[in-house]
Amino acid sequence: MKLNFAATALLIGIFTLGLFCPAAVTAAPRVKHVFIISFDQGNPDLIQKSAMPVLHELAATGARTWSAYTVVPSITLPAHTSMLTGVGPQAHQVLWNDYIPSNGLVKIPTIFSLAKEHGLVTAMFVGKEKFKHLLLPGSVDAFVWPHPESDAKAVAKAFAAQVATLKPNLCLIHFLDPDTAGHKYGAQSPEKMRALADCDAALKIVRDAIAAAGLAGSSVIILTADHGSHDIINPAGKSVGTHNTAETEDVKIPWVAWGQGVKKNFTITAPVLQYDTAATALWLLHLPLPDYFWGRPVTSAFK
């Protein structure tokens, strides 16, 4: 059967539209909200042994690996920068670990700035001032550092007070307590385990606030850490926690996903690296991954 010219042109037009029209190929986001919760110095082995019923429930009913890996240097600011830019320290060049205003801001886009390019709402609730180095102009709608009370409970309460109004599409929540306790009392100390338990109570505040805001059914929560730690004996002869090496105790971190579209009771066997969190967040929100990204979405964790 022969097609006339008009019919042929129509078919070609439909085919071309399907291939090349952005409106035709742009899919809806897999979720509307991604909450990344980072436990500073969150050794996965200690987390599994600590009194953390909320986190353990999310891990058991979601997807998890207790053997994800962070970057080197395994310290807070470089690691979180990788978590939020999708590249390693060699690329983002944030190699310091204090708030040093003269060092300026990260030189490459964060996932917050990429999200803002697509009109999304972004937020950061953090326990340390050094995160200001990641505040690219116009990239974060709400940045909250509840100084001087910046422990996990204070951060969680600040989040709970604003989440229903903000309804952020992309949000980082950072709990500093394990790092504080680990450095002072030891990487595996009872004090650090209590700090992790305090973080779990804060996690409950966050989870309940997400639900109360009506966002639970359209959200994914990612639970992870910047680094682990190990013990050393300080000059006073006391065992204290430290990190910043490539040793397993310092670089192994947890990675848990829970929420809409996450596989139930699933063990992630594929390798997960620190910068994969950035890629996973963009993938969930159906935002394009930059070509320069090192990270790749942890797609195996999702249905």
What are these regions (language model features)?
Residues 23-27:
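Boundary at the C-terminal end of the N-terminal hydrophobic targeting segment
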Residues 133-140, 160-201, 205:
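Active-site His/acidic residue clusters
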Residues 1-6:
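Positively charged n-region of N-terminal signal peptides that target proteins for export
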Residues 45-48, 132-136, 179-185, 230-234, ...:
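Extracytoplasmic/secreted cell-surface and envelope-processing proteins
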Residues 35-38, 54, 198-241, 281:
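Metal-dependent active-site segment of extracytoplasmic phospho-/sulfohydrolases and closely related
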Residues 31, 41, 45-166, 277-283, ...:
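Active-site-proximal alpha/beta segments of enzymes that process anionic O-linked groups
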Residues 84, 242-286, 299-302:
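Substrate-binding rim/cap in mid-to-C-terminal beta-strand-loop elements of soluble/periplasmic
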